[in-house]
C-alpha cells in the first residue's frame, strides 16, 4: 500500500517513529513524504512540495481563507497522487501509529468515497484516511474552492 505523509514546513523528529511503525506493520508499504525538507530515511521517498504544487494549490496558498493550511494539505495530497500516478493511498497525521497492515482493514472502506476519520458529523480530521480514487479528491477540491 502507498502511504503519503505531509509535512507543511519542517519534518518533525517523531515522524521516524511513525514511519518505522508503518514499515514494521505493513510489509507492502511504500512510503512517500511530501515536504520542502529532504528526509534521509531508508525506503522512504521524498516529494518536494514546491516542485509538485499545481496552479490550483498555489492559489490556495496565496488566498485569504481561514483554513488554508488544512485545505492546502488536500490540494498537495492530490498533487502528490498525480505526480506519483497513484490509484490509491493511505494518509494520516504524522503522529498517528498504526498497528495493522492496510490489507487487514481494506474491507471496511468504500470505493469512490472519502474514507476519513470524522471528528463529528460536520468535521473531518486526518486521523486515518484512505483515498481510492483521483475523483474523490477532485470533488472535494471543487467543494472547497
Which sequence ranges carry the predicted segments?
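Low-complexity, flexible helical/coil segments
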Residues: 39-41, 64, 77, 126-131
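Generic structural signal for short, flexible, solvent-exposed coil/loop and linker residues
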Residues: 20, 85, 118-120
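N-terminal anchoring/stem segment of glycosyltransferases
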Residues: 1-61, 82, 134-135
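Glycogenin-like
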Residues: 1-8, 97-145
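A short, glycine-/small-residue-rich helix N-cap motif at loop->alpha-helix starts
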Residues: 14, 65-72
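Intervening/peripheral non-core polypeptide segments
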Residues: 62-65, 95
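GT-A fold catalytic core of metal-dependent nucleotide-sugar glycosyltransferases
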Residues: 69-115
Amino acid at each position: 500500500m502507498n502511504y503519503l505523509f505531509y509535512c507543511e514546513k519542517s519534518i518533525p523528529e517523531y515522524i521516524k517513529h511513525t514511519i518505522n511503525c508503518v514499515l514494521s506493520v505493513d510489509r507492502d508499504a511504500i512510503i512517500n513524504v511530501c515536504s520542502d525538507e529532504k528526509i534521509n530515511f531508508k525506503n522512504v521517498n521524498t516529494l518536494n512540495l514546491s516542485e509538485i504544487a499545481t496552479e490550483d494549490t498555489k492559489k490556495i496558498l496565496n488566498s485569504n481563507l481561514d483554513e488554508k493550511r488544512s485545505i492546502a494539505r488536500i490540494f498537495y495530497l492530490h498533487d502528490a497522487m498525480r505526480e506519483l500516478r497513484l490509484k490509491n493511498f493511505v494518509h494520516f497525521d504524522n503522529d498517528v501509529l498504526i498497528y495493522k497492515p492496510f490489507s487487514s482493514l481494506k474491507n471496511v472502506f468504500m470505493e469512490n468515497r472519502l474514507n476519513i476519520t470524522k471528528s463529528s458529523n460536520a468535521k473531518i480530521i486526518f486521523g486515518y484516511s484512505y483515498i481510492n480514487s483521483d475523483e474523490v479528491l477532485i470533488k472535494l477540491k471543487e467543494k472547497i474552492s
